[in-house]
């Protein structure tokens, strides 16, 4: 991403040496890309993939804004989500980063961990936030109508945040003085819940024990988040200048909204608040507030 003049962020990399940090950003937009056939006159200007191979390629109008970065990027073609062919072509956002055979028709839905969360398991302990999960519609949506592209190790959808101010406050606004007390209370509540669950487990059938174990796994993940928050609570938050940002922006102003969301991701990376981010720009099937974003911004 380019350096946005909106921000004057402290350089988090200065204290970490000169070794570039590896970051992962995954972005999803719905409804496909233009793929005109070679005999179609539109193929020259509007084919999604550049013409040519290796370094000797030419962008079409789809990607020509990336021309200044051509020596720093790789466009990959020829890949396929084979498991996605078993479901409707506009119902597979939930497979975008998991590539899981989620089931179709009468088969029971089952997903798996997404690429971003797998990477976050390796680098997430080095930053305040293991990952940043965002979308335009927010939340999780429904099966085949996902509002998120991030899934935990059990294949459960991770709710996405779509409110710029909420994202900014989470990243850069200091917690109140009661934060330590609330974290201690959360830890105590989780400890009691785990103790009660172990007693309950002795009275359950094998099937119910499996269901309880899945639930307890979520509780343990919450416990890990609480422990991590306690470790970072005395670490100062990055200092940023967002005076020129409109954090109350909504998708009703799509161009500014998208710019703001991408600027937040840039700033999260720049300050090393996280090294993993996902953003579902819109959802499939013409449902939700993001349906007309591309049309609105031209």
Question: For the regions a protein language model found, what residue spans apply to each?
Answer:
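Ligand-binding pockets and gating/stacking loops
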Residues: 1-298
